[in-house]
Amino acid sequence: MSASTSPLIRQRGRESYEITYAAMRAFTDARTAQTADELWIVEHPPVFTLGLAADPTHVLDAHDIPVVQTDRGGEVTYHGPGQVVIYLLLDLRRNHADARIFARELVNKIEQAVIDTLAAYNLACERKAGAPGIYLSDGPLQGAKIAALGLKIRGNGCTYHGVSLNVAMDLTPFSWINPCGYEGLVTIDMQSLGAQTTLTAVQDTLAEKLTRHLSG
């Protein structure tokens, strides 16, 4: 993806997951080879989402939070206020004839964008082989998860779903699930680590980092 075809960035504000999910699918259904790629920035009310591989028993107690089955990869995760969510609506064939091979590179680019975003706030984080997402790389909470990702890549190379980064959340609902299918996985947010920032600032930073890596 060249700089001239950098994705359009759309701020959708706070929106229910079901509305965004339906909109992503409709956008992808309707897109053509000429449709511009887009990044959608959104904040969701509380919701648990299940990936295609999800075991419903990893939702230990949903309380009154909706549980939504999706068509993304991965297991169960939680979205809620104070979390940056960016969905990537891309056509991987535009610059990569074999979209499936590029999919692995895409995951690396997304993860690196998150790592770079956190580094801007002096938070050292890393990826883990075989466990998509971003984790603290040092300190007493080493291994705690701060960002999750899951994608849907259709046979025509078009993607949707994306990445979530915990900024300043009520983390309690993460204890009601086995996050990403891992029992006992600790989940953390930027605020708990001392980062002084706002949701809007992190949205802007992550969108910029994603655009830069996708254009590289």
Curated annotation (Swiss-Prot):
It catalyses: octanoyl-[ACP] + L-lysyl-[protein] = N(6)-octanoyl-L-lysyl-[protein] + holo-[ACP] + H(+). GO terms for cellular component: cytoplasm. Keywords: Acyltransferase, Cytoplasm, Transferase. Its EC number is 2.3.1.181. Coiled coil: none annotated. The keyword Electron transport does not apply. The keyword Cytoplasm applies. This is Octanoyltransferase. It is found in: Cytoplasm. It comes from the Bacteria. One of its GO terms (biological process) is protein modification process. It comes from Herminiimonas arsenicoxydans. Residues 33-216 form the BPL/LPL catalytic domain. Substrate binds at R72, G73, G74, E75, V76, T77, Y78, H79, A148, L149, G150, G162, V163, S164. It is an enzyme of class 2 (transferase). The active site is at C180.
